[in-house]
Amino acid sequence: MKVLSYLKNFYLFLAIGAIMQASENMGSQHQKTDERVIYLAGGCFWGLEAYMERIYGVIDASSGYANGKTSSTNYEKLHESDHAESVKVIYDPKKISLDKLLRYYFKVVDPVSVNKQGNDVGRQYRTGIYYVNSADKEVIDHALKALQKEVKGKIAIEVEPLKNYVRAEEYHQDYLKKHPSGYCHIDLKKADEVIVDDDKYTKPSDEVLKKKLTKLQYEVTQNKHTEKPFENEYYNKEEEGIYVDITTGEPLFSSADKYDSGCGWPSFSKPINKDVVKYEDDESLNRKRIEVLSRIGKAHLGHVFNDGPKELGGLRYCINSAALRFIPLKDMEKEGYGEFIPYIKKGELKKYINDKKSH
C-alpha cells in the first residue's frame, strides 16, 4: 500500500509539473483581466526586450523562443527546433492599444527582410507576431496592411497563433540591464519618438473656435497674428508638462525640449513628434521664413529658425503662447496624456543645460 501511495503521489507530482511547464511554454500563464499579451519576434531578443520595456503601457517584457517545431528548446538548439527569438509583451490595453504597440514594433524591424535583422542572420532571427487571442488577428492584419502601403517589397513578418513557446534562459532575461554596453541592433531611443494618433483629434468649426478662444488666441491661430514678446503666458515657463494645440488638444511640444532662447516667445528644439506640425513658406514682412502650423487644427503656431542649439539639432521653434495650452505633468494622466509622461521626464535637454552651466 505504501508503494502504491508513493507511486500515486509521484505521478501526481509529474502531472502537475507537466501542466505548469506546458502553461509556461505555451505562454498561457494566467493574465489579469486588465492585461493583454502578444509575442513579437524581431531579431536578437536582447534589444527588442529592452526597447519594449520603454514603451508606455507595457507592463513587462521577457525573452523566449516561439513557434518552433518542438515543445522544448534552448539557445543552442534553435537551428534544430526552428524557434524564433521572441519577446513576450504584457501590456495594459487601457494605456496602449495593440495597434499602437505594433506600430512601435514596426519602427525597429526591417519588415521585408527574410531571416535577418541587423547583423544577425538565420531562421531564429526572423520577424513574427504570435497571438494567443484570436481577436488580435484582425488587428494584426489591419496593422500589416497599413504598413505594406508604406514600404517597398513584400512584408516578411510571420503571423501565427502562438505555439511551442519556451521562456529563454535566465542569462538572456533583461540582458541589456545587466550589460548596458552589450550588443544591441536596435536604436533604443526610438522608444522616445512618441506616436501621436491623428484620429483622436478634430478641428472645431470656426463658430465654435470663436466661442472657445480668446480674441488673441483666435487672431493668432486663425489669422496668423503674432503676440507681443515677453508679454505672453509661457515664454519663461519652466514647469514640466506638455504643450497642446489650443484649438484641438493635439500634443505639439514638451517641456523636455523647451529652452530660453531670449527671443521673448516659447522656444523648443523640436516638436514632440515630427508629424504633428506642418510647414509653409512665409514671405510676409519682406523676408523669407518658415511658418509652423498644427497638423489637425491647421492653426498658425509660429515659425522655425535654424539658429537653435547645435547640440539639440540646431533648430528653434519660436511659438506663440496664444496657440498653446499647457498641461502640467501632474495633470497629464487625468487629462488623457499619460502616454507622453515618459517623454516629458527624459533628460536630454536638462543634461545639455546642466552641462552648459558647469562650463
Curated annotation (Swiss-Prot):
Entry keywords, A to Z: Multifunctional enzyme, Oxidoreductase
Biological processes per GO annotation: protein modification process; protein repair; response to oxidative stress
Gene of this entry: msrAB
Taxon lineage: Bacteria, Pseudomonadati, Campylobacterota, Epsilonproteobacteria, Campylobacterales
A cellular-component GO term for this protein: cytoplasm
Residues annotated as domain MsrB: 206-329
Name of the protein in question: Peptide methionine sulfoxide reductase MsrA/MsrB
Protein family according to the UniProt entry: In the N-terminal section; belongs to the MsrA Met sulfoxide reductase family. In the C-terminal section; belongs to the MsrB Met sulfoxide reductase family.
Catalytic activity, EC: 1.8.4.11, 1.8.4.12
Pfam family, one: PMSR
UniProt enzyme class: oxidoreductase
Coiled coil: none
Active-site positions on this chain: C44, C318 (nucleophile)
GO terms for MF: L-methionine:thioredoxin-disulfide S-oxidoreductase activity; peptide-methionine (R)-S-oxide reductase activity; peptide-methionine (S)-S-oxide reductase activity
Functional description taken from the UniProt entry: Has an important function as a repair enzyme for proteins that have been inactivated by oxidation. Catalyzes the reversible oxidation-reduction of methionine sulfoxide in proteins to methionine.
Species this protein is from: Helicobacter pylori (strain ATCC 700392 / 26695)
Residue numbers spanned by region Peptide methionine sulfoxide reductase A: 36-189
Catalytic activity of the protein: L-methionyl-[protein] + [thioredoxin]-disulfide + H2O = L-methionyl-(S)-S-oxide-[protein] + [thioredoxin]-dithiol; [thioredoxin]-disulfide + L-methionine + H2O = L-methionine (S)-S-oxide + [thioredoxin]-dithiol; L-methionyl-[protein] + [thioredoxin]-disulfide + H2O = L-methionyl-(R)-S-oxide-[protein] + [thioredoxin]-dithiol
